């Protein structure tokens, strides 16, 4: 939370990450954010609406009260009414300026770099885990823990990739429902009862899970390819079927149902074993990189 001292001495607490929102605030944010992403809502409008919800500030009621009071003063004391009108104008400008600054400081959902919108995909856990039974979890605290399976992750990655193939709202909703079905162990028909905020928010959270592995100093090699464009041997880029086959040939069983972290570790071990074997046979690092699709830097780290 970000603490801001107000003029009256009270402290305003503004969230700086997704996990600091209440359930109601989270759903409201996930309702509006797709419109921001689609360019149908200004980022500042999102920030202002969330600020008003978080603070409970209701500007319309205050303006109405002041207009009524000023009308009463015009009837009883015109001179004071004129002074009050100017005071209200200055107060309104001050309040508006403060609202703008506070709203623009809300960055739990995204950051703005000029006109570029950078979404925040970081969640300490699935924000909807308490709303949906049998939800996939991915907890990031002192250590990372998950109940997600290799199959759930792989299918989820494929579905996220499909989102880019069609821009129509109907297609996006279809893919988001399929993704939620995978991650919440639901049938496709059962996802019809999930709010749009949960569907979109689930995709945002899962994108953060994928991002975690892509940016990880070790697991990241499973997603990287060399400039030659070939797939990394034993890596995630091969596709689920080939990865399962490779791991099962190496002695692993029921790979699709493996815990996601165990699945990732198994792939890393398989790659390291293959690289070590090639190096022992005298194959140069550059040749290993060319064959496997790994970068030379990744190969050198494993030799």
Residue ranges: model-predicted function:
Residues 1-286, 296-302:
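An amphipathic, hydrophobic-aromatic interaction surface with interspersed Lys/Arg
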Residues 289:
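The alpha-helix within a helix-turn-helix
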């Amino acid at each position: 939370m970000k603490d801001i001292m107000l003029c009256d001495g009270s402290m305003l607490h503004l969230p700086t990450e997704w996990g600091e929102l209440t359930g109601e605030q989270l759903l409201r944010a996930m309702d509006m954010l797709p419109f921001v992403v689609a360019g149908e809502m200004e980022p500042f409008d999102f920030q202002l609406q969330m600020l008003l919800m978080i603070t409970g500030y209701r500007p319309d009621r205050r303006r109405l009260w002041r207009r009524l009071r000023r009308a009463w003063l015009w009837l009883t004391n015109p001179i004071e009414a004129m002074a009050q009108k100017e005071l209200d104008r200055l107060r309104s400008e001050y309040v508006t300026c403060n609202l703008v600054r506070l709203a623009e400081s809300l960055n739990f959902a995204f950051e703005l770099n000029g006109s570029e919108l950078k979404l925040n995909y970081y969640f300490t856990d699935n924000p909807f885990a308490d709303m949906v039974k049998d939800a996939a979890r991915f907890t990031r605290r002192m250590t990372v823990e998950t109940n997600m399976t290799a199959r759930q992750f792989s299918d989820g990655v494929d579905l996220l990739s499909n989102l880019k193939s069609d821009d129509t709202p109907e297609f996006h909703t279809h893919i988001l429902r399929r993704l939620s079905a995978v991650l919440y162990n639901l049938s496709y028909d059962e996802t019809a009862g999930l709010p749009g905020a949960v569907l979109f928010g689930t995709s945002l959270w899962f994108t953060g899970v994928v991002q975690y592995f892509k940016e990880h100093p070790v697991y990241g090699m499973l997603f990287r390819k060399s400039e030659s464009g070939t797939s990394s041997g034993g890596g995630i880029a091969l596709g689920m079927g080939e990865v399962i086959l490779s791991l099962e040939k190496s002695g692993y069983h029921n790979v699709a149902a493996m815990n996601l972290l165990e699945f990732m570790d198994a792939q890393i071990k398989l790659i390291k074993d293959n690289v070590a074997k090639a190096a022992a046979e005298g194959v140069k690092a550059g040749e290993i990189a060319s064959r496997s699709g790994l970068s030379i830097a990744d190969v050198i780290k494993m030799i």
